[in-house]
Amino acid sequence: MPNHDFLHSLNEQQQKAVLHTEGPLLLLAGAGTGKTKVLTSRIANIIHQNLASPQNILAVTFTNKAAKEMQERVHNLVSSYGLNIGTFHSMAARILRDQIEHLNLGLNSRFTIISQDDQLRLIKDIVKLKNIDTKKYAPKLIHIVISRWKDQGLLPNKLSSSDTNLPLQRVAKLVYEEYQQNLLISNVVDFGDLLLYNNELFIKNPDILKHYQERYRYILIDEYQDTNVVQYLWARMLASLSKNICCVGDDDQSIYGWRGAEVGNILRFEKDFLNATIIKLEQNYRSTLPILAAASNVINNNKNRHGKTLWTDKESGEKIKIISCWNDKEEARYIAAEIARLVREGRYSAGNIAILVRAGFQTRSFEEAFINSAMPYKIIGGLRFYERMEIRDVLAYIRIALNQNDNLALERIINVPKRAIGAVTLNKIKLYAIEKNISNFAAIKEMLEDGEIKTKSYETLKDLVTKISNWHERFSFDAPINVTKAILDDSGYLEMLQEEKTEEALGRIENINEMLRAIAEFNDIHDFIEHSSLVMENESLETSYGGSVTIMTLHGAKGLEFDVVFLPGWEEGVFPSQRSLDEEGEKGLEEERRIAYVGITRAKKELYITHAESRKIFYEIVRSYPSRFLAEIPEEIIIRTSSIKKYDSFYKF
């Protein structure tokens, strides 16, 4: 019998989901319905009933933060040593390292994972080598096309004529072939390769697939509505033997179609897994009745969805406030003043209030309004730690020390600090490497030995090669923190920053020191490199909101909650986005409506929705009309008003 500690705090539907232990289960979890609690209780129950050991359970999430939270919650319920909880990418990387030789690609288990920035740099190099017109075919667009193909599970040799109908696609295919070859030569992979190669591995090696099918007897996938094709295929293959797969998601919160997420994955679950059980979690523990009514009435206008209706046993709360403003500046002034009033009256702290915008261009007017009102605020969406220049530089030094075939890492650090290695010499090295089909580092070594480099760069390159070789050897016996400090000193990188003596340089040194603190927690430098790569790709919001109002996009707010939420810019063309309507038609409209649903359900107690009669978009004043989504909210739960002059004076703090 299950431990009833897992059940006593769960409602009836949540209990059903926890006690379901055999066969496929689709858990349709509406916003704020306690899905994480159900997931962790379900894992704990499986372990407690001895249906599987922790090592035989695989739980997959989209972010490191979610994986860590799930791990901690399960551990608080039962002993769960050996439980496999992680992101799609981390789990796929683990399998690939163990089985990479079976793919016969030339990769070995010490491959590194390159960042988005390095991916783009490589594509730019290929575009330049092939003399492709970057005005017609921007490298960023080519990168997007290649990434989308990988999300669909398509390697260059699997692209059909329908995949290359457009001129951009035909150019992207040429670049894609060269791009993959460069990755293999450098013994690196990108994030798209991790799952793509996993699926290739399973298809070509049924015995390996069976091994993992037998190992992972219970599979749980969180945020299933956000899976792309290659993630979906990976999960389906792993679960096809035991059929004990539990997919948790909410088709009404599928808002990442632009990056490859396929809402159809959750809609066709019953076809993929016959005799599947579907359980709906509809009791909301977050929001008030009017907020839930607004969300439900908006999303009910979507046709392609599993029907469900959120409800709560909370007493009715504040009505939804819909405010009409003269223009976008007045809208920002009104919101800043209203927030100031709520905080001044002691009803809410600034940290429990959020402004959620549809598009980045909307934030500037709020910055100005908050500066004028002396209201503390924070715009979420700046550079993350591992995306900062100095951190990427140090990571590149570590990568080239570990993997001397990593062309991208070498290219990044070869003149940082400045070493006077000119463009002519660099180009000569690249051409030599291409001709010999070897890495750039190997090319430098051969050219130095053969006297191919006779410029003043000779001594500099010889010194760099020696240092990289020494660092490589030292990593085999010394602690990662010690070797990294040596790299910073020997390379002159730290000295370069110290000599700048600017506030910016001091900030960069502080960041490097923080990075060293992170490295000190790892015994194996490869584990740190993999950790940093996965964090860069999946890093979720770690910000403490303190006493600042949060300004962020609706996409960024998914999974968060605030006492008070302001939703500005609810006008046709802004929200729903005109681009989505033009490019995707009805499909785009339904995704926009799901974004609206996500925004509404972030609010716990009060919700404000504003729209402007005119808006400045890209330097042009445009007449605006209220969003069609506003007409989908019942009048009986709305208070309509207009912004007025009194909000021109601000409460000071």
UniProtKB/Swiss-Prot annotation:
Keyword vocabulary terms for this entry = ATP-binding, DNA damage, DNA repair, DNA replication, DNA-binding, Helicase, Hydrolase, Isomerase, Nucleotide-binding
**What are the EC numbers?**
5.6.2.4
Q: Which GO terms describe its molecular function?
A: 3'-5' DNA helicase activity; ATP binding; ATP hydrolysis activity; DNA binding
Pfam families under this entry? UvrD-helicase, UvrD_C
Q: Identify the residues that bind ATP.
A: G32, T33, G34, K35, T36, K37, R286
Record PROSITE patterns: UVRD_HELICASE_ATP_BIND, UVRD_HELICASE_CTER
Q: Where is the UvrD-like helicase C-terminal domain?
A: 289-559
Q: What does this protein do?
A: Has both ATPase and helicase activities. Unwinds DNA duplexes with 3' to 5' polarity with respect to the bound strand and initiates unwinding most effectively when a single-stranded region is present. Involved in the post-incision events of nucleotide excision repair and methyl-directed mismatch repair.
Q: Record's family?
A: Belongs to the helicase family. UvrD subfamily.
Official protein name in the record? Probable DNA helicase II homolog
The source organism is: Rickettsia bellii (strain RML369-C)
Gene symbol here is uvrD
